[in-house]
A protein has these predicted regions:
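Long, hydrophobic/aromatic-enriched structural stretches that serve as scaffold segments
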Residues: 132-135, 161
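Compositionally biased, charge-rich terminal segments
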Residues: 1-8
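Active-site proximal beta-strand in glycosyltransferases
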Residues: 152-168
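Nucleotide-sugar donor-binding catalytic core of glycosyltransferases
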Residues: 15-122, 130, 138-147, 170-270
Length: 270
């Protein structure tokens, strides 16, 4: 068998195995959700839960909030998350990457613990100096330990967890009993924002308060432009999950797809 054919078969087998794992995970959470008699919270339930949880806090006008944001700018976050948050107030932003590179193979053994300590110390200093209204994070279990999130929670500032693609990554890989996704950290946040509707039950089972907000687009950036069309279909996003298999199938059906982002032959757009 040629090497190229073997690689394709291996990728397809990996996709099949992951699909089975995700299906099993989905069914297990469905069963636990039903057996515990849980319910997905609606807007009124979320408001009541936050009111009871965040005693002593009062609403502020839009634009008047003091916000601490914790996330790494992979490629889109700085141009999307930060301007969106700034509509609600001032934003102080922590990105650990320059001091703690989390892309190395030995990240968990070498610098994860140090990064987590720095995160808690830095945010603690900012909280003491500024008394922010909210801490907004785009994190995962791969990046932070559950006890790190508990330490952040102890500062007494409302915390929001933002997560994308919980269909594949709510649990994700598990190393040393800890999930790379949101499973082990979500319960320590006051509110968990997920773009994956069928992950709501997973959050409830793990003791979190979830809200479903579907992915959208920033109309200031993503809008029709009068440009010559040179590509049948374009996709912009990192290469992972079922994306390669989806694009492979489209190409096999005669739909020419050009993909851009980390991991694709075309590379990122910026």
């Amino acid at each position: 068998m040629e090497e190229g054919s073997f690689k394709r078969l291996r990728k397809r087998f990996g996709h099949w195995r992951k699909t089975k794992r995700l299906r099993r995970e989905f069914l297990e959470y469905q069963a636990r959700f039903a057996s515990q008699g849980l319910a997905i919270p609606d807007d009124s339930s979320i408001r009541l839960a936050l009111k009871n949880r965040l005693t002593g806090f009062r609403p502020k006008p839009k634009g008047a909030l003091s916000i601490i944001a914790v996330y790494h700018n992979y490629n889109w976050e700085e141009g999307a998350l930060k301007p969106a948050l700034e509509k609600f107030g001032t934003v102080r932003y922590y990105d650990w990457f320059e001091a703690f590179d989390h892309t190395g193979r030995d990240w968990r053994r070498s610098v994860k613990a140090e990064m987590n300590r720095d995160l808690v110390v830095r945010i603690g200093q900012w909280v003491a100096a500024e008394r922010p209204d909210v801490i907004f994070t785009y994190l995962s279990g791969e990046l932070v330990f559950p006890e790190t999130v508990q330490a952040l929670r102890s500062f007494g500032v409302p915390m929001i967890h933002f997560s994308l693609n919980d269909k594949e990554h709510f649990v994700g890989k598990v190393r040393g009993g800890l999930a790379f996704g949101s499973r082990d950290i979500c319960r320590w946040f006051d509110l968990c924002w997920t773009s994956t509707e069928d992950a709501l039950k997973k959050y409830c089972v793990e003791g979190a308060l979830p809200v479903y907000l579907p992915e959208g687009a920033n109309p200031e950036l993503h809008r029709p432009r009068e440009l010559e069309k040179t590509t049948d279909v374009s996709f912009v996003g990192q290469r992972y999950g079922n994306r390669p298999e989806t694009i492979r199938r489209l190409n096999a059906e005669g739909v020419r797809v050009e993909a851009f982002g980390y991991g694709w032959p075309n590379g990122p757009l910026s």
